[in-house]
Amino acid sequence: LNPLRGFCSSANQHPTDNTYPYYYSGDYEKYRNRRINYVLEILNKATPKDMQTLQNDNFSLLAAETLPFLLSNIVDSTLNPQQKKILSELKNWNFITDFNLKTPSYFYKWWSELLKITWDEFAQNNTTMRIPDDFQTSWILRNEPNFELIDIKKTPKIETTSDICNISFKNMTDYFSQLPKEAKNADWQF
C-alpha cells in the first residue's frame, strides 16, 4: 500500500490527526517535519543525492513564517545606523542558516529576546508551567495582538505586539554591539 502522496516520512511530528478521540500529551516538532514533507512533495523521483541534500537542508521554517511579521512591526525611524544595517540584512535573508552567515544569529537572538519579554510572567511567578513553544508563540504573536501576556508586567505601560517586537529587536542589536572585543571576530565588527 503506497500512500497517496507518494512517500512516507517521520520527523517527530504529531502522530495522529485531529480525529483521534483520546488525549495524549507530548512535545511534537512543528517545523522540521513540515520542511521535510514540503521538499519531498516537490521532488519527483528522489535520488539518494536528493535525500542527502535534504538531510543537510538548513532552511528555517520558523524564520520564514515569523520574521516577515516581526519585521513589519519595526519602527525603523527610531533605529540608529547599526540597527538599520541589521534590519536590512534580516529583510534580505533567505532563511538559510549556514554557519558562515551572521543573519541567522541575529534572528535567533531576536527570537530569544522576544520569548523572554513575551513570557516574562512565567519567570516572575516562579511557576513550573512551561512557556508555549515556538510554534504557539509565533501563532499568538501573529494572530492575537492583544493577548494579555504580551504586556511586560514590570512596566506601567501596556505593551503591544509592536512594542515587544521593537524592544526585543533593540535588545538583540545591543547584544551584538556589546560583545566583548575578545569575543568578536572580524565579521562581528560593525
Residue ranges and their predicted role:
Residues 13, 52-190:
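Acidic, low-complexity N-terminal propeptides/linkers enriched in Ser/Thr/Asp/Gly that mediate export
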Residues 1-85:
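Structured mid-domain segments that build the active-site/substrate or prosthetic-cofactor binding neighborhood
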